[in-house]
């Protein structure tokens, strides 16, 4: 689940049984290029299942139910929580709305042997990993802190206050990157995407180190 703002409370559900499909959980700070990388992966992995979040907020102009989000009522979302139907969920903007990752579509894709990509924030990645220990968590990192600052400021879409808040959150996220199974440095889109494709389709080394994750790092070098 890609949150629209910082979650106030993050919740998970009971562990899910493993299957044949590989599940990659992608996270990283704002402006690191997650959306661009996700688009690349969806183009290159034809049978990829990209997890679409459920949310209680109203659709924005141009958003399509089932494509951008599964838009549900607060009552229905609570029912999903009660049924244990979410891998993770969060309360956004002090409980203004809730968003979460539906377990059933992920489970079905795994059963079909399809690779699954879930894009979530740091807390969401931890919750999914707890619910699905066999999932591979991947942190998409910038080449440097200065590069991340430049990307965030260069977008020109946020106020200085919002930028400062996002950078503060990014510092926390960057400090936690070695908690992930893999770290991919997004220096160049082509290399970062190729590395993630190999993780999704199973051509990369073992999913995770059962003796204790060290956050194996792969740097996408510029040409």
From Swiss-Prot:
Q: Which residues bind ATP?
A: 28-35
**Where do the segments described as Disordered lie?**
1-22, 204-223
Main localization of the protein described in the UniProt heading: cytoplasm
A Gene Ontology molecular function term for this protein is: ATP binding
Q: Which InterPro entries match?
A: GK/Ca_channel_bsu, Guanylate_kin-like_dom, Guanylate_kinase, Guanylate_kinase_CS, P-loop_NTPase
Record-annotated Guanylate kinase-like domain positions:
21-201
Protein name, per record:
Guanylate kinase
**Phylogenetic lineage:** Bacteria, Bacillati, Actinomycetota, Actinomycetes, Mycobacteriales
Q: Which GO terms describe its cellular component?
A: cytosol
Tell me the organism: Mycolicibacterium paratuberculosis (strain ATCC BAA-968 / K-10)
Give the Pfam families listed for this entry: Guanylate_kin (PF00625)
Q: What does this protein do?
A: Essential for recycling GMP and indirectly, cGMP.
Compartments in which it is found: Cytoplasm
**Reaction(s) this enzyme catalyzes, per UniProt:** GMP + ATP = GDP + ADP
Say which domain of life the source belongs to. Bacteria
Keywords (A to Z) from UniProt: ATP-binding, Cytoplasm, Kinase, Nucleotide-binding, Transferase
Record EC number: 2.7.4.8
Report the family membership.
Answer: Belongs to the guanylate kinase family.
Keyword Kinase attributed: yes
Q: Where is the composition biased (Polar residues)?
A: 212-223
**Which regions are flagged for Basic and acidic residues bias?**
7-19
């Amino acid at each position: 689940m890609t949150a629209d703002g910082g979650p106030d409370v993050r919740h998970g559900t009971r562990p899910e049984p493993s299957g044949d499909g590989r599940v990659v959980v992608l996270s990283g700070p704002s402006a690191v290029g997650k959306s661009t990388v996700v688009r690349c992966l969806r183009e290159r992995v034809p049978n990829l299942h990209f997890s679409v979040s459920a949310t209680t907020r109203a659709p924005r102009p141009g958003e399509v139910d089932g494509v951008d989000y599964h838009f549900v009522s607060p009552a229905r979302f609570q029912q999903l929580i009660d049924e244990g139907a979410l891998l993770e969920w969060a309360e956004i903007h002090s409980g203004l709305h809730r968003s979460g990752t539906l377990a059933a579509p992920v489970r079905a894709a795994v059963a079909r042997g399809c690779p699954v990509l879930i894009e979530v924030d740091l807390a969401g990645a931890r919750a999914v990993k707890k619910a699905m220990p066999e999932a591979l968590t991947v942190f998409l990192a910038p080449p440097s802190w200065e590069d991340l600052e430049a990307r965030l400021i260069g977008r020109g879409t946020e106020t200085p206050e919002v930028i400062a808040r996002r950078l503060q959150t990014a510092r926390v996220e960057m400090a936690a990157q070695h908690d992930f199974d893999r770290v991919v440095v997004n220096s160049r889109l082509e290399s970062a995407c190729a590395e993630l494709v190999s993780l999704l389709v199973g051509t990369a080394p073992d999913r995770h180190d059962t003796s204790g994750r060290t956050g194996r790092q792969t740097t996408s070098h510029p040409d």
